[in-house]
Amino acid sequence: MQTVLIALLRFYKVAVSPMLGNRCRFYPSCSDYAREAIQYHGAARGTYLAARRICRCHPFSAGGIDLVPPPTSEKR
């Protein structure tokens, strides 16, 4: 599942993102953040973190540096 999601993100970055222009208010960009989150946290949690990030990326947001949180070693 991770591989499929990352492939979709790469497709978005190559095919769709250039048409929309650079609009992300954060560093790293939302698509890079999503890729890192999925790689570090897996498909489910990574997608959740990416969705939260995308919801924060809007014209009224200050933006800035927002890195993917490190994985926790605790099992719940």
Swiss-Prot record:
Pfam families: YidD
UniProt entry keywords in alphabetical sequence: Cell inner membrane, Cell membrane, Membrane
Subcellular compartments: Cell inner membrane
Bilayer disposition of the protein: Peripheral membrane protein
Principal location: membrane
Entry keyword annotation includes Membrane: yes
InterPro entries the UniProt entry points to: Membr_insert_effic_factor_YidD
GO CC annotation terms, alphabetical: plasma membrane
Family membership noted in the UniProt record: Belongs to the UPF0161 family.
Function description: Could be involved in insertion of integral membrane proteins into the membrane.
Protein name from the UniProt record: Putative membrane protein insertion efficiency factor
Record organism: Paraburkholderia xenovorans (strain LB400)
